[in-house]
């Protein structure tokens, strides 16, 4: 398959993720949109790695996945703390945690 198709798909996935981050107010949906954007970046890294015939892009994609796994743990803990205190998963309630 043509590598340009993978890059177009990656751009489309990143755009969908960015739209989800900017438009939605639910913390879980925003969190999933960020993960979608990270996976789009991974697809781009692997595509360029395949084009150039090197492993650097695949190694960087692996490290992005490791960081994303750590982000999942921390992000879900924060979302759970917000939900327990406010009974809502809205992004607007994040500012209220400091009171």
From Swiss-Prot:
Keywords: Cell membrane, Membrane, NAD, Quinone, Translocase, Transmembrane, Transmembrane helix, Transport. It holds the Pfam family Oxidored_q2. NDH-1 shuttles electrons from NADH, via FMN and iron-sulfur (Fe-S) centers, to quinones in the respiratory chain. The immediate electron acceptor for the enzyme in this species is believed to be a menaquinone. Couples the redox reaction to proton translocation (for every two electrons transferred, four hydrogen ions are translocated across the cytoplasmic membrane), and thus conserves the redox energy in a proton gradient. It comes from Parafrankia sp. (strain EAN1pec). One of its GO terms (cellular component) is plasma membrane. It is a multi-pass membrane protein. The keyword Coiled coil does not apply. The chain crosses the membrane at residues 3-23, 28-48, 62-82. GO terms for biological process: ATP synthesis coupled electron transport. It is found in: Cell membrane. Gene3D superfamilies: 1.10.287.3510. This is NADH-quinone oxidoreductase subunit K. InterPro entries: NADH_UbQ_OxRdtase_chain4L/K, NUOK/Mnh_C1-like. The gene is nuoK. One of its GO terms (molecular function) is quinone binding. Its EC number is 7.1.1.-. NDH-1 is composed of 14 different subunits. Subunits NuoA, H, J, K, L, M, N constitute the membrane sector of the complex.
């Amino acid at each position: 398959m043509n590598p340009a198709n993978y890059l177009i798909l990656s751009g489309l996935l990143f755009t969908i993720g960015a739209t989800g981050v900017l438009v939605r107010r639910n913390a879980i949906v925003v969190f999933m949109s960020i993960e979608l954007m990270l996976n789009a970046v991974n697809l781009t890294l692997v595509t360029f790695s395949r084009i150039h015939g090197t492993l650097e892009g695949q190694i960087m994609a692996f490290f992005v996945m490791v960081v994303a796994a750590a982000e999942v743990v921390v992000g879900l803990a924060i979302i759970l703390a917000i939900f327990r205190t406010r009974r809502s998963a809205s992004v607007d309630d994040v500012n209220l945690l400091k009171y």
